[in-house]
From Swiss-Prot:
GO terms for cellular component: membrane. Its main location: membrane. It comes from the Eukaryota. InterPro entries: Ion_channel_UNC-93, MFS_trans_sf, UNC-93-like_regulator. Widely expressed. The lineage of its organism: Eukaryota, Metazoa, Chordata, Craniata, Vertebrata. The gene is Mfsd11. One of its GO terms (biological process) is response to food. The keyword Protein biosynthesis does not apply. PANTHER family: ET TRANSLATION PRODUCT-RELATED, UNC93-LIKE PROTEIN MFSD11. The modification Phosphoserine is found at residue 204. Signal peptide: none annotated. Belongs to the unc-93 family. This is UNC93-like protein MFSD11.
Amino acid sequence: MSPESKKLFNIVILGVAFMFMFTAFQTCGNVAQTVIRSLNSTDFHGSGYTSLAIIYGVFSASNLITPSVVAIVGPQISMFVSGLFYSMYIAVFIQPFPWSFYTASVFIGIAAAVLWTAQGNCLTINSDEHTIGRNSGIFWALLQSSLFFGNLYIYFAWQGKTQISEHDRRTVFIALTVISLVGTVLFFLIRKPDPENVLGEEESCDDQDMEATESAQNNVTKAVDAFKKSLRLCVTREMLLLSVTTAYTGLELTFFSGVYGTCIGAVNKFGTEEKSLIGLSGIFIGIGEILGGSLFGLLSKNSRFGRNPVVLLGTLVHFVAFYLIFLNMPGDAPIAPVEGTNSIAYIRPSKEVAILCSFLLGLGDSCFNTQLLSILGFLYSEDSAPAFAVFKFVQSICAAVAFFYSNYLLLHWQLLVMVIFGFFGTISFFAVEWDAAAIVARGSDYRSI
C-alpha cells in the first residue's frame, strides 16, 4: 500500500470508528432527557441537561492538558481508552442511579477531551495541505452518518409510545453499548503513517540506542511542550478570532444534539408520534450533516473561493432554521414537564416544518465544522494537538453553558443567543480566512476547501 493510500485508509477507519461510537453516544444524548423524564416518575431523579452540562464542563477543563496525554501515549491508544469510557457512560442507562449517572458524566468529559485532541492529531498527521480539505470532509460525513443509524432505530422502536418503559430503555442502551465497543476496537486498525524522513545509512545503531534510553525524558519534554503550546495558542490573533466561531458551534451543538429533540418530544400537538419524531429528527440532522460533509469534501480540490462561502451558507441555513423553529415550536418546549406542553407558537406545530428544520440544522453545522477542521489543520499543521485542544476547549465550555441555561431559558431566548453568536462568529471566521488566503498568495500551494 502506497503512503498516500495508507493515509486515506487511516482517515476512513478513523471516520468509521467514530461513526460506530457516536451512533451510540449521539443517539444517547438525543434521547437522554426524554428517557430521564420517564425515569423521574420512579425513584430516579436526575436531568439529562445537567449531565450534558457536566460532560462539557469537565471536557473544557480537561482540554488544555490532553495534548500532553496524546504526546506521551499517542493518538491510537488515547482514542481506544477514551472509547471505553464512552461505552461505560452509555451502559449506565441500562440501570441508572443518580450517583453512577453523574459520576460517569465526569469521566466521559475527560475521555472526550482526550478523544477529540487525538482525533485532530490523527487527522492532521494523515493529511497535507493538498488533502486536509478532502480528509476533513470524509471524516465529517462518516462521523455524522452516526446520527442516521441510531435514530432510525429510535424512530421505529418508539413509534406510538408516549412513555419509555424499562424494557424499551434497556433494549436500546444494551444495543448502543455494544455498538460503541465495536467502534472502540476499530481504532486498532489505524496504521502509523510512513515517516517523511527515513533513517539514513549514516545514522548508526548507537544513535538509535541513545534515542531509546532517552525516551522517558523525551516523553516528559513532549508533555510540557504540548501544554506550553496550548497556552500560547490561546492568545494568538487567529485563535482568538476562531474562538468566536467555535463558541457558536458549541451553542448550536447543544441545541441540535440535546435541546431540539427534547422540544419535539414535548409538543403534545404532535400526538402519539411525538417520541418517535425525536428519532426522525435525528435522522434528518444526520442527512444534513452527511450531505454537507460529502459535498464539501468532494469540492475541496476545485473551489477557488476558499472557505468563506461555505461558512456564509452555514450561517444563512441556520438563521432560516432558527426562524422556522421560532414560528413552529412553543416557547416552553425545552423546559416542559413530563406531561409535555399544549402551547402553540405563531403557527400550529407542523411535523414537516420540524423535520425540515432538523435537516437545516445538520447542513449548517457541517458547513461550520468542516471549515474549522480544515483551517485549523492548515494554520497549525505543526501544532495540531494543541490547536485542536484549544478548539475543543472553547467549543465544549460553550456547550456546557448552553446545556446549563437550557434548564431555564425559554426557546426564543435560546434562539436569540445563537443568532448573535452566529453573526459575530461568521465575521471573525472571514477575518482568519482572509489571513490564510494571504499565506497562500505568499507562496503556499495549499488548496482550501
